Amino acid sequence: MSTGLTAKTGVEHFGTVGVAMVTPFTESGDIDIAAGREVAAYLVDKGLDSLVLAGTTGESPTTTAAEKLELLKAVREEVGDRAKLIAGVGTNNTRTSVELAEAAASAGADGLLVVTPYYSKPSQEGLLAHFGAIAAATEVPICLYDIPGRSGIPIESDTMRRLSELPTILAVKDAKGDLVAATSLIKETGLAWYSGDDPLNLVWLALGGSGFISVIGHAAPTALRELYTSFEEGDLVRAREINAKLSPLVAAQGRLGGVSLAKAALRLQGINVGDPRLPIMAPNEQELEALREDMKKAGVL
C-alpha cells in the first residue's frame, strides 16, 4: 500500500494546474515558434505551473518529431524553470516513442506524457511491454495517459498497479473517468492523478486528484488556478462557483473539440496561434460567435 510518497514526487515533476498547450501555426501551416513562445509565457504568467507540449491538443498526430522538439526547446528557453514542461511522446509504435522520449529528455523535458497506443489495440501485456520500454529509455518521469475513447483500449486496473511499480512512472492523466476504480488506484499506487477531462476537474480533486491537465485552461488560466487554490484552502463554495462559471467553456469544448476550442479562444483573447492542421477544422463564423458568447458567460472575454 502506498504512503502517498509517489503522488508527492509526481506533483514535484508534473505540477498542479496545467494545459495541454496548442501548437501554433502560421497562415501557411508551418509551425510558429514565436507564437509558441508567446502563448507559453502568457499561460505561465496567468498562473499555470505546467505545460504539456505535443499532446492531443498540441496536434501530435500532425506534427513531426522535429517540430515537436523545436517547440519544446523554444518554450524551455522562454519560460525557464517557471513551469514544468511535459513532452508528449506517446505513439502507437514503441520504437518511435522510445526515440521521442530520448530526444525530449535531451531537449530539457521535465516529464513525459505517454498515451496508450492507439488504433493497434494491443493486449494489456502489450501495454506493459510498451510503457516499460519507454520507461527504461530515460530517467525522465512519466505520466501515463489513459484515454480509451481515442486509443480504443483502457489501461486496466491490474496493469496500472504493475506499471506503478516502475520507478519513473509517477503520474496518470485520466480521460477515462472510471471514478470508482480510480479512487482505489489513487490510494493503492500513490500515483499523482490528473484530470484529463475538464468536466471532471473538481470531481477529481474531491477524489484525491493532484491537479488538472486542461484544455479550457487556455481560455481561463487564472480561473483554473483559483479553482485549484480554493479547493486546496478548503473554500469549497468558491471552488464550486468557479467550476460552474466555467461550464460554458466545457460545453463549447464539447461542440468544437479541444484543438479548435483552444485556438479560437486564444484568438478571441488577442493571441493568434493560427488554425489547426487538417483534418481538424477551425470554427466557422457561427461557431465562433457562439464561442464568443460562451466566453463572455464564463467571464473570460
Curated annotation (Swiss-Prot):
Pathway: Amino-acid biosynthesis; L-lysine biosynthesis via DAP pathway; (S)-tetrahydrodipicolinate from L-aspartate: step 3/4
Pfam name, any one: DHDPS
Principal cellular location given in the protein's record: cytoplasm
Record flagged with keyword Secreted: no
Catalytic activity: L-aspartate 4-semialdehyde + pyruvate = (2S,4S)-4-hydroxy-2,3,4,5-tetrahydrodipicolinate + H2O + H(+)
Enzyme class: lyase
Site location (Part of a proton relay during catalysis): 56, 119
One record GO biological process: lysine biosynthetic process via diaminopimelate
Coiled-coil zones: none
Enzyme Commission identifier(s): 4.3.3.7
Binding of pyruvate, residues: 57, 213
Active site, renumbered: 145, 173
GO molecular function terms noted in the UniProt entry: 4-hydroxy-tetrahydrodipicolinate synthase activity
Gene Ontology, cellular component aspect: cytosol
Keyword Ribosomal protein among record annotations: no
Annotated compartments: Cytoplasm
Keywords on record: Amino-acid biosynthesis, Cytoplasm, Diaminopimelate biosynthesis, Lyase, Lysine biosynthesis, Schiff base
InterPro entries attached to this UniProt entry: Aldolase_TIM, DapA, DapA-like, Schiff_base-form_aldolases_AS, Schiff_base-form_aldolases_CS
Function text: Catalyzes the condensation of (S)-aspartate-beta-semialdehyde [(S)-ASA] and pyruvate to 4-hydroxy-tetrahydrodipicolinate (HTPA).
Family, similarity comment: Belongs to the DapA family.
Subunit composition and interactions: Homotetramer; dimer of dimers.
Protein name in UniProt: 4-hydroxy-tetrahydrodipicolinate synthase
Protein source organism: Corynebacterium glutamicum (strain ATCC 13032 / DSM 20300 / JCM 1318 / BCRC 11384 / CCUG 27702 / LMG 3730 / NBRC 12168 / NCIMB 10025 / NRRL B-2784 / 534)
The encoding gene: dapA
